[in-house]
């Protein structure tokens, strides 16, 4: 188990009164000027802090990792840092219990993944029809019998270490006449016969995340799907994530929203110094699940919101039904409301797939600025380019087309393109500036930048662009460097903020 670094600030060293597990590194510091580590996983505060100390804590600890003991009578700056870091009040009488049971959930890394659909096998005993639909899932139809039996299983077991908790989330669709269960079995490492844990989850259990905690030896888990009844069953995807239980998704404080179609979107809000603007960053395509851009956005010092999703392979461009898309716009607006900001104090940003999230939701929110790198706008054209311009380069684009339009016809290609551009053309951009870096020979969406310019009809809209030679993924370093520089300039010039925090 990785070490958990704890910073305790107070007039006395509480570790002398506690039993500290081997995996906890307890750092008692009363003078915060002596806090040399770049950051800590958890902070326990049992005295008030002044302004200088509050500013140090802002740099040293992440939001949602500050715990204020309940016997502290808070003052102005203690209240300020507790608000910024989204502190929780902890009963001093339960501190030992917290150290024993919960502090291990504040590990510094994040990890999540979707089982590769190629690792999904259908049971040989199933005699019905099977239709494979890329990363959109596999559709089964037939008679599964009167009792639960294995209809599918995932090859490639994942390790679960002693004391570790793993979340599982199953995306599926089915007829009411079909019932399912998820079975997870754990074996001892190096053995396929020594079964040490078995969990069976019902449909009611599967309405939310299910998790397994390994209190035995290290060992891999094998996952299978059981079914009974008769009808259609679509297995969309199975996700496994290192769990923080009630403390958040991926990061402490991470929020997970799920639509009635079992589609997820994730958000992480850090209030920063609680001064404008609110910087929103949409994660790009990635197969390892979780939030992107945390360190980059945090160094800016301002409030920020990370948005991520894990549908298909690496993401589905934040497109969905009204319920799903409303999660995103409502989530952003809620953060603005918490801060007391309006949309003139909002910046939407992203790279590659994240640019579509920024542009698409920008149509609905009309922010102060949209800062993007490697823009992708015409999703239908991106799918078309998979055939000739970029064979095998981004097959997810084909899944996105089928997911939203049902097939890969020219009519569907045009429809997916128009879905974005029609909304873009109806938007009042008069109060928004666009800052865009793009690849001159982009093989994903080669017309995105020029079309953005040609579709902005509002007089006086500021557009700053920089073209870099290469295909879509040829020079990400230069794109990101310019992206950061322009973000810095926007914060300085438009919001009178200082240099980025280089801490």
Regions found by a protein language model. Give the residues of each.
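Alpha/beta-hydrolase fold nucleophile elbow
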Residues: 340-352, 356
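Conserved alpha/beta-hydrolase
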Residues: 301-314
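A short, well-structured beta->alpha microelement
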Residues: 10-56, 261-270, 415-420
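Short beta-strand element of the alpha/beta-hydrolase
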Residues: 275-285
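The feature captures the conserved acid-bearing segment of alpha/beta-hydrolase catalytic domains
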Residues: 391-465, 470-499
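Hydrolase active-site cap/lid region
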Residues: 363-405
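Beta-strand-enriched, solvent-exposed domains that form extended recognition/catalytic surfaces
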Residues: 109-253
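Alpha/beta-hydrolase active-site loop
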Residues: 318-341
């Amino acid at each position: 188990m990785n070490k958990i670094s704890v910073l305790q600030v107070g007039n006395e060293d509480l570790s002398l009164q506690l039993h500290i597990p081997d995996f906890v590194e307890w750092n008692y510091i009363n003078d915060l000027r002596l806090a040399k580590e770049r950051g800590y996983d958890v902070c326990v505060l049992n005295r008030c802090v002044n302004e200088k100390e509050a500013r140090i804590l802002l740099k040293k600890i992440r939001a949602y990792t500050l715990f204020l003991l309940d016997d502290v009578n808070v003052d102005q700056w203690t209240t300020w840092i507790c608000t910024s870091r989204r502190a929780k009040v902890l009963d001093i009488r339960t501190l030992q219990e917290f150290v024993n049971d919960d502090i291990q959930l504040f590990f510094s890394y994040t990890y999540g993944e979707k089982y590769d659909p190629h690792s999904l096998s259908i049971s040989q005993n199933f005699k019905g029809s099977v239709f494979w639909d890329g990363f959109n899932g596999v559709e089964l139809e037939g008679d599964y019998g009167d009792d639960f039996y294995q209809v599918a299983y995932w090859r490639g077991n994942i390790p679960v270490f002693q004391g570790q908790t793993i979340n599982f989330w199953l995306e599926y669709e089915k007829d009411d006449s079909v019932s399912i269960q998820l079975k997870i079995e754990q074996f001892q490492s190096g053995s396929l016969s020594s079964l040490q844990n078995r969990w069976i989850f019902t449909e009611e259990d599967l309405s939310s995340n299910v998790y397994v905690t390994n209190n035995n030896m290290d060992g891999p888990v094998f996952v299978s799907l059981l079914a009974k009844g008769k009808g259609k069953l679509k297995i969309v995807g199975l996700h496994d994530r290192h769990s923080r239980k009630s403390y958040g998704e991926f990061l402490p404080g991470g929020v997970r929203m799920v639509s009635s179609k079992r589609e997820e979107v994730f958000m992480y809000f850090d209030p920063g110094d609680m001064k404008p603007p609110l910087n929103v960053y949409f994660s790009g395509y990635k197969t390892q699940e979780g939030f992107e851009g945390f360190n980059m956005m945090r160094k800016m010092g301002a409030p920020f919101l990370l948005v991520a999703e894990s549908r298909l392979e690496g993401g589905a461009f934040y497109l969905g039904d009204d319920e799903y898309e409303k999660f995103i716009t409502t989530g952003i607006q809620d953060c603005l409301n918490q801060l007391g900001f309006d949309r003139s104090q909002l910046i939407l940003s992203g790279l590659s797939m994240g640019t579509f999230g920024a542009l698409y939701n920008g149509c609905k929110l009309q922010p102060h600025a949209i800062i993007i790198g490697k823009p992708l706008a015409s999703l239908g054209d991106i799918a078309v380019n998979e055939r000739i311009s970029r064979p095998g380069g981004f097959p997810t684009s084909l899944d996105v087309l089928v997911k939203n339009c049902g097939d890969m016809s020219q009519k569907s290609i045009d429809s997916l393109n128009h879905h974005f551009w029609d909304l873009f053309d109806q938007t009042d951009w008069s109060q928004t500036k666009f800052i865009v870096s793009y690849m001159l020979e982009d093989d994903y969406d080669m017309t995105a930048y020029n079309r953005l310019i040609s579709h902005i009809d509002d007089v006086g809209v500021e557009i700053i662009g920089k073209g870099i030679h290469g295909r879509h993924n040829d020079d990400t370093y230069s794109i990101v460097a310019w992206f950061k520089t322009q973000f810095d300039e926007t914060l300085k010039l438009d919001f009178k903020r200082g240099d980025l925090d280089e801490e």
